[in-house]
């Protein structure tokens, strides 16, 4: 049986997870939605939703984003179904088109001057 990998997360990551999970929990409670109701709408288990609300870093990012969308927490400074998000996606795709497909380390120049 493979050993479980122990990961460490930066302080910034931990704080961002805590913030997002708090926003999700607050929005759910403000909208008077039960954990079971949100979990069913997101297609996840109730225990997964509880882990999301406790800022567990091992939760799938897609599940976290779906729950945020369901309870009305805007992501990336954009309102739900906002053209602003679509514009950001387009700009990112344009930038990626200009960049090389792979990131390669620069090779050391050979000094062959004698």
Predicted segments, located by residue:
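A short, Lys/Arg-rich alpha-helix, primarily the initiator
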Residues: 2-30
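Short amphipathic alpha-helix starts
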Residues: 42, 50, 75-78
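DNA major-groove recognition helix of helix-turn-helix/homeodomain DNA-binding modules
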Residues: 60-78
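Short alpha-helical DNA-recognition segment
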Residues: 32-48
């Amino acid at each position: 049986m493979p050993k479980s990998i122990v990961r460490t997360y930066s302080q910034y990551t931990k704080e961002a997870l805590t913030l997002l999970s708090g926003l999700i929990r607050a929005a759910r409670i403000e909208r008077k939605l039960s954990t079971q109701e949100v979990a069913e709408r997101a297609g996840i288990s109730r225990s997964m939703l509880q882990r999301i609300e406790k800022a567990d870093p091992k939760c799938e990012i897609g599940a976290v984003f779906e729950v945020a969308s369901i309870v009305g927490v805007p992501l990336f400074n954009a309102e739900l179904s906002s053209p602003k998000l679509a514009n950001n996606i387009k700009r990112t795709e344009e930038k990626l088109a200009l960049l090389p497909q792979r990131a390669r380390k620069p090779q050391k120049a050979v000094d062959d001057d004698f």
